[in-house]
């Protein structure tokens, strides 16, 4: 339960957090008097800051120092005292539209580019997960003869990801087949598969009733059932380690990362323990309004992963319609520009949702 604050207390908390974010220095009443028009005396500010400290929203890192926000102070600041920057949100959308070439680039390169843009605009470590293939649908299936007795099954999803599987021809022929006959048969089967499966999700393929295929293609029926379903199952397995990460070097130069050991644990999480991070930022939102992305802000100790318990993690899910595909995230020490970071993440998630629609 959040502390109930008066308007004056909210205003002074807002000014304290804002000044600390900008300077990384403990904040005293003198600094607030000089920078903000609070309409009260220095003594009143000191008294209010004392109340905020007793409420657990501020604390003194040293006895003689000013005050800095606690996780609880940041939480009220984020939930009650700020509004995400609409100007920066439009700048993000414009940058993504102008700099990304959806027709010419691979999906991985596109998301790497998007992550770099977000890192530049937010000043945070940017994180973008690859789309989950278990939510993808079939764009095209093709069976091709590679050599005598060997064929390849190629699956292209609507995310433009390509997956393939090499297989032997199904048994059951009384004589060695003519390669041209096999090519014609494979094209007929490919056309049949596309007419039945195009637009279906990979999960639907694995539970599809193949009896109709069995009746029309007795020779290929069981073979197709195991081959296509097997490839779809393999493709649909969540790839929990696929995260595009950018902006690490700049963030690690922040004063909060002055200890080498802390830097090492952050880098280890980003490079070697991405599955833990993926499970934290990828969540299926419960949204009534699917036109805009919900943003989750985890501050400091709200993060369950030890390496980022002094950081804030801002994330939002991008999707196709109501189906979650992946997530956009930003992270840096809890002393960050939340108005900008939240706006950047929300705008990027909305852009990707529209792009994948």
Curated annotation (Swiss-Prot):
Name of the protein: Heat-inducible transcription repressor HrcA
PANTHER family the record matches: HEAT-INDUCIBLE TRANSCRIPTION REPRESSOR HRCA
UniProt GO molecular function: DNA binding
Family per record: Belongs to the HrcA family.
GO terms classed as biological process: negative regulation of DNA-templated transcription
Functional note: Negative regulator of class I heat shock genes (grpE-dnaK-dnaJ and groELS operons). Prevents heat-shock induction of these operons.
Recorded superkingdom: Bacteria
Keyword check for NADP: no
InterPro entries linked to this entry: GAF-like_dom_sf, HrcA, HrcA_C, WH-like_DNA-bd_sf, WH_DNA-bd_sf, WHTH_transcript_rep_HrcA_IDD
Organism whose genome encodes this protein: Anabaena sp. (strain L31)
Keywords linked to the UniProt accession: Repressor, Stress response, Transcription, Transcription regulation
Lineage of the organism: Bacteria, Bacillati, Cyanobacteriota, Cyanophyceae, Nostocales
Gene from which the chain derives: hrcA
Ranges that cross the membrane: none
């Amino acid at each position: 339960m959040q502390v109930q604050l008066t308007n004056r207390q909210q205003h002074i908390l807002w000014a304290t957090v804002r000044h600390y974010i900008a300077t990384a220095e403990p904040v005293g009443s003198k600094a607030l008097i000089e920078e903000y028009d609070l309409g009260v005396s220095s003594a009143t500010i000191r008294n209010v800051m004392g109340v905020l400290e007793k409420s657990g929203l501020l604390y003194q890192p040293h006895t003689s120092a000013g005050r800095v926000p606690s996780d609880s102070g940041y939480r009220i600041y984020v939930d009650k005292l700020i509004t995400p920057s609409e100007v920066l949100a439009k700048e993000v959308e414009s940058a993504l539209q102008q700099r990304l070439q959806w027709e010419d680039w691979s999906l991985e390169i596109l998301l790497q580019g998007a992550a770099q843009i977000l890192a530049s605009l937010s000043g945070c470590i940017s994180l973008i997960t690859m789309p989950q293939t278990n939510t993808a649908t079939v764009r095209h299936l093709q069976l091709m003869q590679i050599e005598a007795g060997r064929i390849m099954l190629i699956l292209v999803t609507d995310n433009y990801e390509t997956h393939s599987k090499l297989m032997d021809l199904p048994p059951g022929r009384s004589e060695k087949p003519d390669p041209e006959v096999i090519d014609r048969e494979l094209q007929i089967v490919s056309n049949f598969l596309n007419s039945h499966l195009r637009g279906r999700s990979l999960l639907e393929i694995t539970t599809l009733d193949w009896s109709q295929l069995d009746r029309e293609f007795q020779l290929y029926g069981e073979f197709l059932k195991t081959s296509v379903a097997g490839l779809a199952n393999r493709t649909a397995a969540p790839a929990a380690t696929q995260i595009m990460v950018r902006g690490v070097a700049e963030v690690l130069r922040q004063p909060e990362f002055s200890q080498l050991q802390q830097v090492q644990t952050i880098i280890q999480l980003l490079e070697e323990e991405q599955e833990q991070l993926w499970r934290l930022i990828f969540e299926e939102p419960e949204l009534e309004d699917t036109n805009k992305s919900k943003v989750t802000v985890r501050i400091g100790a709200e993060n369950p992963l030890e390496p980022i318990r002094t950081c804030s993690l801002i994330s939002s899910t991008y999707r196709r319609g109501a189906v979650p595909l992946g997530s956009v995230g930003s992270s840096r020490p809890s002393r960050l520009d939340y108005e900008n970071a939240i706006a950047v993440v929300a705008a990027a998630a909305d852009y990707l949702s529209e792009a994948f629609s």
